[in-house]
């Protein structure tokens, strides 16, 4: 029951993010977009992974980057160009894309703030404008596990709770100022309570 509720909340949150992306960055049918951080999991059936590819109006203009095999992704989204690569070392020229998108990925980048900064700056290098989201460290519910204040605990205790919930990814949550400092230029940070969204450059 809790899982179904969480899936519905997650989907609504992602739909709102897509609407905000469309409103703020105003892409059109010719706009090239890179999405960094896709997975090989299908969209639907309770999963909201790869929602951007499933809901974006012009999927043929998307390039999606993931760090694992993307065989199922490619089968599910044949119009999208899929590339396997490390988000910190993207195989594209400077400014190759009009827009860059990354949803709830940066908090999973291993290696602390410097590696998170490297990830964000690489997206900024290849895309002329970017839209980056992450859970808000100051929101009292840890959004991956729905455990209150789990992300405020010391790392050891936090990691034990995450593992007990079947979650073994790296988790380095960010607050608004920490997110803004990852960028090589000034960004607007939209605080939606549970979620932070950085859009830039200004």
Question: Each predicted region: which residue ranges?
Answer:
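Class I SAM-dependent methyltransferase Rossmann-like catalytic core
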Residues: 1-28
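Surface-exposed cleft-lining segments at the edges of enzyme active sites
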Residues: 3-8, 105-115, 166-170
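Soluble or luminal CAZymes and related metallo-dependent hydrolases
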Residues: 9-17, 115, 171-178
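Conserved SAM-binding loop
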Residues: 31-139, 200
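Conserved class I S-adenosyl-L-methionine
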Residues: 129-156
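Short alpha-helix
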Residues: 161-186
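Core SAM-dependent methyltransferase catalytic element
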Residues: 184-202
